[in-house]
């Protein structure tokens, strides 16, 4: 399962080895100044918007990679059944949103809010 952590002045989405292979990237690193809002969505599918662009997904199982929508693009690492951390980003960031399934979503939100 992907991990969303604060590393110094950055928010980092670290992917597991299988996720790295599917997403074709090791991590997504963004400055904390790019974070506009961070919340927990109780249903995993609520973090998704738009359509997959360079993404892998299995319906009702997982979604991983870049999703396009009319306002821009999001990076998602979402697994079925469970809450997701949704990080909405400022226009200067390469993505508009990160949506991530994590083992402790409330803890991740607290950690980001403390430093952002």
Name each model-derived stretch.
Residues 23-32, 36-116:
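Acidic, Ser/Thr- and proline-rich intrinsically disordered linker/docking segments
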Residues 1-32, 36-39:
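Conserved beta-hairpin
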